[in-house]
Every structure is written in structure tokens, then in C-alpha cells.
A protein has these predicted regions:
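Distinct, well-ordered alpha-helical segments
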Residues: 92-104, 124-127
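Substrate-binding cleft and catalytic face of glycoside hydrolase catalytic domains
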Residues: 1-98
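Structural recognition of the beta-strand scaffold that forms the well-ordered cores
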Residues: 39-43, 83-86, 111-115, 134-139, ...
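Active-site beta-loop-alpha junctions enriched in small/polar residues
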Residues: 43-48, 87-92, 115-120, 140-143, ...
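Alpha-helix termination/capping residues and helix-transition junctions
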Residues: 33-35, 106-107, 164
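Aromatic/acidic polysaccharide-binding cleft in carbohydrate-active enzymes
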Residues: 137-182
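Glycoside hydrolase catalytic-domain groove-lining segments
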Residues: 73, 77, 81-84, 105-149, ...
Length: 182
């Protein structure tokens, strides 16, 4: 939620961090009421996007703090069946993600890591260093949605890269969007 960010960074106030963890539980509850099970969550989509519209980036320290001290404990209490994955990783900054994953509390906090876009560039190195995690790809690059032969070849190359480097899932959810939006 944009009200939890200032200057496009998540506010690192314990009240806001706990509120955000509670939001996850509310969404999981709402989905459950609709008969939709949630088996895994990631703390934020594209947490390294610096855009010209309001965003919510995170520092490595903030990512560790939120996942270790707030999200994982809250879910363990209220939704122990839901796994926590680190993601989505949309940066090729190995140093940042390595800093997060090297925290000694992370193996007890997350079960996997989700990648998309530039994050795929560091997948092989991270998987080699951290083989204990499950790895997934979370959003296919769809470009301008042309879905022509050239786009198919590009997507096939992406699938080959992610699956060939140990991802257990390849997600192309954006392929089902309506042309021109809703």
C-alpha cells in the first residue's frame, strides 16, 4: 500500500512492518473465504523497481527485517501452511540479494526465491551458492504482448534459461490479460 511508503521506500517503522504482515493474513483469509487456497507468498512484487510512478523499493536490511521479524512469524502464527519465498527478485545486483540470503536467519524464514526480468541474470550464481532453496520464475517477459513468432522464440529462450537453471516453475500469468486492459 502506498501509504506505507515515503520517497518510494517502505517506511521501516515497526508499526508499519507489522501492519503490512497483517495485510498478508487478511488477504489469505479473504482468498480462503472464496475457496482459493494460498500456499506461498512473497513480500513484494518488483521491489527494485524505480519508476516515474509511486513505488515501494526496499533496502537489503529492510527486506531481512520484514521477512525475518514480521512476515514469517505472523504467518507461522496465523497461517502455518503458507510458505514464504523471497521475491520477486527483479534486479541483477548479486551483491544485494547475496546480502539478504547470507543472513543466517534466512534459511529458517524462507523456503524459496522467486525471480523475474533482470533477476534471472543472477539465478545461476545464487542457486550454486544457496542450493537449499527452491527456485521459481514469477513473471514472463511479455514485451508489448505481440505474441508473434519472435516473441515465442524469446519466451522459449527464457523458459530454457529459468528451467535449465533449476527453477521448478515458470509463470506466464500475463499471457491471459485482455488486450488493452480490463
Amino acid at each position: 500500500p502506498h501509504q506505507l511508503a515515503v520517497n518510494d521506500y517502505f517506511i521501516q517503522d515497526p508499526r508499519y512492518l507489522q501492519t503490512y504482515a497483517n495485510y498478508f493474513c487478511k488477504f489469505i483469509d479473504a482468498y480462503k473465504e472464496q475457496g482459493i487456497p494460498v500456499s506461498m507468498v512473497m513480500f513484494q512484487n518488483e521491489s527494485w523497481s524505480y519508476t516515474n510512478y509511486p513505488g515501494c523499493a526496499w533496502t537489503p536490511e529492510g527486506i531481512i527485517r520484514f521477512n525475518v521479524e514480521y512476515l514469517a512469524p505472523t504467518l507461522k502464527k496465523r497461517h502455518p501452511e503458507v510458505k514464504v519465498y523471497l521475491g520477486t527478485i527483479n534486479t541483477n545486483r548479486y551483491d544485494i540479494i547475496d546480502q539478504v540470503l547470507s543472513d543466517p536467519r534466512m534459511p529458517e524464514t524462507i523456503q524459496g526465491v522467486g525471480f523475474q526480468w533482470e533477476g534471472g541474470q543472477i539465478l545461476p550464481r545464487l542457486r550454486a551458492k544457496y542450493p537449499q532453496y527452491k527456485y521459481v520464475q514469477t513473471e514472463s517477459e511479455c514485451g508489448w504482448g505481440s505474441f508473434d513468432w519472435k516473441a515465442a522464440e524469446h519466451t522459449f529462450g527464457l523458459m530454457n534459461h529459468y528451467l535449465g537453471n533449476g527453477c521448478e516453475e515458470y509463470t506466464f500469468w500475463n499471457a491471459i490479460l485482455y488486450d488493452g486492459g480490463f
